[in-house]
Structures are given as C-alpha cells and as structure tokens.
C-alpha cells in the first residue's frame, strides 16, 4: 500500500464515517431539539426522517450521475453538500431550517455512499490489496455507526445539541483536502443515462407519502391536506411505474420484481429497516422522556444494539455458505421479533431487560441482512446485478424513512386518542385538562409543564405525570406491536417462498458475475452490518 492509496483509503473511509455517524447520532439529541424549538412529535419525526428521505430519493440517481460525470467529482459534491448541511443544522434558527438542512445532509450522504467504495476499488486494482483495503474501509465506517449514539450523548451533555453537527466540520474539511490532493478520478463509460423524469416522480411519490403519514395525526387523517397528499403519492407512484416500464434507461428496473425471491428479499429488507429504525427512535424517546436518562446514558443504553450487529455480522457470511440463506433469514426475523417483544414488556421492569431486548434486535438484524442480500443477488441475471443492488440501497433508506414516519405517528395518534380522557382522573377541570394534554402531546414529553398548567391544589387522586408516562409507554408498545406484526407477515411470506437452495455466501458471488463486474463488501446503513454492493469495473 503506497502513500496515495493510504490517503485515498483515509479520505473515503472518513467520508463514510461521517454519514454513518449522523444516521443515529441525532436520536439522542431529540429531546434537547424539542425544547429548543418547542415542537411536537411530528417535528421530531421530520428531523430524523428528512435525512433518510434525502438518501432514499437520490441514492440511485447519484450512482448514475457518478458513473457518468466521475465518482471523485460526485464524492466531492456529496461531502461538500453534507458538510454545508451540517453547518446549516448547527446554525438552524427554526425547526423548518433544521429539517431542510437534514434533507441536504441526506442528499450529500447518498452521493458519498455510492461513490466511496468505488473509489477504493479503483485505487487498489490488485485483488489481495483490495480485499485488505475494503476491510479497513468497512471497519472505519462501522466505528461511525457503533459509536454514533454514545458520542452524540456525550456531545449533547457537554456542549448542547448543535455540537453533534459541528463535529462534522473538521472531518469534512479534511476529507475534501485529501480527496482533492490524492484521490484519482474514475467513471463508467457504459453507464446508463440519467432518468430525470423518473427521479422527479420518485421524489413526489415518496415525499408526499411521508408527509401524509407524519402530519396525519396532527392535522387529521380526513383533512383536505392529508387526502391531497395521499392522492399525490398514489398518482405519483402510478406514473412512476408507468414511466419506468416504458423507459429505455429507467432509474429503477421494475421487471426485476417479477422474480419472487428478489421481490420478497426487497420487501424483507425494507420491513427490517422500517421496524428497527422506528424502534430506535421510540426507544430513545422512552429512555430520555419517560425514564429521565441523560443523553450520554441514553447513548450507552443503545450501544448493545450496535455492538450486537458489529459482532454478529462478520460471522454470518460463513454460516450462509454452509447452511444456505433461508434459515439465517428466518432465524434473524424471529430474533428481531423476540427483541421487540422484550422491549414491549420491559418498560416497567429493570433496564437490563431493555439492554437484552436491544441486543436481541441487533443480533437478529445482523443475522438476516447478509443472507437477504445473497438471496436478492443470486435471483437476478449477472448483467443486471448493479441495478438490483441499487434498488436494495434505495429500499433500505425508504424503509427507515417510513419507519420513522409510521411508528412515530402511531405514538402520536395513540396519545391524541387516550391522554385527555385518562387525565380526567387527575385534572377534573376540562379546560386545564385539554391544555395540559395538548402541551404534553405537542412537546412529546410526559413531564412537560405540568406544574405551570395545573396548580398542585387542582390535582386529584393521580399524578398527571404518572398518567402521561403510562400513556406514552402504552403508545410505544402499540407502535412496537405494529412493527412486530409487519415482521411477522414478512416471516410467514419468507417461510413460504424463500428458496431452500441458496448456499452462495456474499463473498462468493463473484463466481457468477462477468469480469466486467466486481463484487465488494460494503457497509449498510445499519450499524456495523456489511452487505454486498456491485460496481461496474
């Protein structure tokens, strides 16, 4: 490994480290962000969902543009946009600016994630050096995701929530300097054309759906605004499918979904990310707003999830090679559902059960991600493997975005339906009760301003804080049950339709690909996990 190769590896690894760090670091800062801007559950959902939404809508087009215009160029664009977005997040004077800046971060992260590994692959043409470099690159990125919640908690406790964004500035500047000075350009002369119409329709469909799901509990599911957004999403999706089926250079090749194994693998991976990222959002809020933990302690409490993913992931590839993909997928889904059920029934008990539940969730995720990728990539022709991999990347981001939106909205809807009637046991005055319920729901905090709204002498029988905490716990339980139910549906479908004869480990997929393609091990958007990404040589 010469000096240029080493610095290329550092530049690409640090870029990926930044975007993976921000995938989870924001969660522990949400209560502080809420207090700064006085926003409700929907505002917090937008803060976390806008990042993954930006990635979801742009990741496939970013790969095409990078192949056409140069991967180094788009890596620089991605890092620059991500860094500028971080500055805007840190300086944000309102929740609207913060949400917009998070979306810009997501767009930059999409460009970084699809170009980083390609630049490493081009810098190390020799097979053994390439494998070693990718191992180091993967480790650097994994550190970002496994340490994100813990580092975020420490930063928030010491310097406030804005510091979690400012920490990206020196790293971004270093990555830009190293990339400009040492990273060589590469591109793909056979890349397909950029599908602008498909990209715009994809943004409209996904964006309208996420907006309707997040805002529905606040503005009403039958309101004109919600109905218009749902119809916009439906029409946008229909037009997108119609256009992509007729395009000679589609952004998303929908004919791949004719294969049952591939379609089921995509549905499974989307559902896993839906459940896990929604769970992480709700668990973080529970630990801080109900248990009263500080951000740093909350970050440490989340660590078993990330650690389990990091520990189990490297072992799964060998397991798939020996026993096939079907058993690890189904076992991983079972373990993930068991972890969610443990979280559902652990709120009133010891923190140890929460830690065990998070560890089971992490182990289940790690156990099923690699074999799902194996099933998907062995189900498609070799010449379409790049497109198949790109669709998987987009569906991961879409799953996490919808998870934030749906599970957060389930909690908000539960509180809207139950909190005010339950508060009648403690606050008999209907005006005070209504105002208190609205403030608790809007602040997403069961302890919010109780003393300032209801004087102690007006409280009867029950403590309103205790009632609100019980409703929050029940709302989180309902949301996690929704996540568990979606996983159960996918499990039953997998039991019926996942193939029984897929024994090809991710590292062996190169045997079935033409020499024009190289198969590399990339880090997914899940902490510590690895998956297969295919790059044109």
From Swiss-Prot:
The keyword Metal-binding does not apply. GO terms for molecular function: transmembrane transporter activity. SUPFAM superfamilies: MFS general substrate transporter (SSF103473). Signal peptide: none annotated. It is found in: Cell membrane. It is a multi-pass membrane protein. One of its GO terms (cellular component) is membrane. Contributes to spectinomycin and tetracycline resistance. Belongs to the major facilitator superfamily. EmrB family. This is Multidrug resistance protein Stp. It comes from Mycobacterium tuberculosis (strain ATCC 25618 / H37Rv).
């Amino acid at each position: 490994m010469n000096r240029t190769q080493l610095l290329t590896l550092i530049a690409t690894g640090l870029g990926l480290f930044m975007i993976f760090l921000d995938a989870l670091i924001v969660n522990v800062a949400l209560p502080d962000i809420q207090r700064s801007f006085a926003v409700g559950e929907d505002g917090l959902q937008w803060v976390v969902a806008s990042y993954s939404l930006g990635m979801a809508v742009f990741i496939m087009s970013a790969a095409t543009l990078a192949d056409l215009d140069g991967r180094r160029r788009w890596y620089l664009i991605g890092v620059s946009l991500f860094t500028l977005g971080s500055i805007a997040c840190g300086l944000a004077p309102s929740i609207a600016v913060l949400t917009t800046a998070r979306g810009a971060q997501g767009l930059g992260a999409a460009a970084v994630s699809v170009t980083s590994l390609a630049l490493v692959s081009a810098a190390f043409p020799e097979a053994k050096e390439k494998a070693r470099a990718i191992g180091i690159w993967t480790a650097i990125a994994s550190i970002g995701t496994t340490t994100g919640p813990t580092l975020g908690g420490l930063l928030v406790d010491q310097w406030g929530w804005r510091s979690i964004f400012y920490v990206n500035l020196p790293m971004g500047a270093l990555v830009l300097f190293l990339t400009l000075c040492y990273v060589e350009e590469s591109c793909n002369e056979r890349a397909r054309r950029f599908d602008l119409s498909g990209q715009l329709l994809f943004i409209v469909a996904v964006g309208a759906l996420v907006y309707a799901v997040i805002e529905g509990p606040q503005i009403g599911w039958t309101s004109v605004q919600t109905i218009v957004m749902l119809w916009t999403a439906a029409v946008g999706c229909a037009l997108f499918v119609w256009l992509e089926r007729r395009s000679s250079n589609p952004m998303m090749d929908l004919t791949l979904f004719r294969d049952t194994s591939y379609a089921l693998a995509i549905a499974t991976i989307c559902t896993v990310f839906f459940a896990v990222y929604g769970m992480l959002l709700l668990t973080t809020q529970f630990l801080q707003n109900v248990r009263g933990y500080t951000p740093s302690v909350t970050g440490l409490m989340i660590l078993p999830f990330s650690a389990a993913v990091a520990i189990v992931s490297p072992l799964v590839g060998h397991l798939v090679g020996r026993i096939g993909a079907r058993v690890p997928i189904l076992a991983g889904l079972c373990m993930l559902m068991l972890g969610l059920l443990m979280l559902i029934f652990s709120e009133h008990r010891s923190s140890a059960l929460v830690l065990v539940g998070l560890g089971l969730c992490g182990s289940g995720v790690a156990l099923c991600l690699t074999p799902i990728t194996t099933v998907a990539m062995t189900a498609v022709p070799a010449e379409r493997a790049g497109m198949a991999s790109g669709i998987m990347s987009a569906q991961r981001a879409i799953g996490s975005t919808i998870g934030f939106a749906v599970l957060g909205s389930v909690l908000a809807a539960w509180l809207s339906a139950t909190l005010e009637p339950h508060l009648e046991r403690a606050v008999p005055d209907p005006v005070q009760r209504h105002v208190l319920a609205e403030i608790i729901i809007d602040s997403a905090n069961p302890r919010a301003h109780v003393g300032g709204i209801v004087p102690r002498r007006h409280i009867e029988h029950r403590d309103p804080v205790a009632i609100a905490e019980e409703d929050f716990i029940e709302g989180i339980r309902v949301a996690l049950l929704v996540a568990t139910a979606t996983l159960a549906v996918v499990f039953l479908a997998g039991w019926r339709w996942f193939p029984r004869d897929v024994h090809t480990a991710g590292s062996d997929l190169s045997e079935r690909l033409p020499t024009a393609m190289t198969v590399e091990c990339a880090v997914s958007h899940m902490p510590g996990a690895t998956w297969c990404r295919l790059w044109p040589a």
